[in-house]
Curated annotation (Swiss-Prot):
A motif (RxLR) lies at residues 110-113. This is Secreted RxLR effector protein 85. The keyword Mitochondrion does not apply. Has the canonical translocation RxLR motif, but lacks the canonical EER motif, which characterizes most oomycete effectors identified so far. Secreted effector that partially suppresses the host cell death induced by cell death-inducing proteins. Its main location: secreted. Belongs to the RxLR effector family. The keyword Mitochondrion does not apply. Keywords: Host cell membrane, Host membrane, Membrane, Secreted, Signal, Virulence. Residues 1-27 form the signal peptide. Disulfide bonds: none annotated. It is found in: Secreted; Host cell membrane.
Amino acid sequence: MRYCAFRLGLFFIGYSCCVLLSTPTLASSLEKSDAESTQTEQWNSNGKRILEADDPKLSLEGERGITPEVVPAFEAIGKAKTPEKAVPRMSLRSKLNPVNWAKGLWFKLRQLRARYRAWRLRRIIADKRGLGPALLNGLTPLHVKNVKDETIRYSKFGPDAINQIEKDYDSFVKLYFAQFDGLHKDPPIVKMDILDKMVKEMSSIERLAVRTSLDRVRLTVDAGYSFEKLISLDVSPLLYMRLLDAEGAFSDVDKNRDAINHLKGYVKAYYKHITL
């Protein structure tokens, strides 16, 4: 029994050695490829040059298809599975960067602010009495323009929605500056009867808010600021005109010519600023 086991073991050892010796090694493969690559140029019996596999002209002029030997390799690459949660190194580093966190938080805050301002503006404009109360409280085209730009920037609107927003804004600007058509006549014709009637119909709290807005405009104008400064403070041109009307400037045009001309200049500068 031991003798049979010994002979069987010798048989397996011999078989393994034969298989090992018959398999080409990496070194022999490299030597063979080097030997074949050195013979890149041969001549046939007719004196014509024969191109071998390593010749660059053959690779350019020969067939460009995939050989049958390479097909299984490409199929194996196609079937190879990659990790589902593989994250690029730069992407992971970018996500862990505190600066990017701060930028993302700042963007979210600006987005929330833009949405709140747009919501608040819609509520103001949706008043059943129209735009009158909003204008009396200091609503200006510059404020509407800022809200419009923020809404477009921080919201995902399509081209049609953006065009509609722009049209609504242009309509508001046209309606707003139509109130100054009589200002440029000689003598100026300013009609505040509709707004004055609207103020009388307001509640006590609403009238207090309108008076506060008018007093704020008076203090700013009396400070003697330039047009650029007044625009940066977003002083309402309509409330400025209403202030001069309340002070009786249009009742005596010759006496208040400088104040009226200053208002005309400010309206012109304001319109130019928002239409740039």
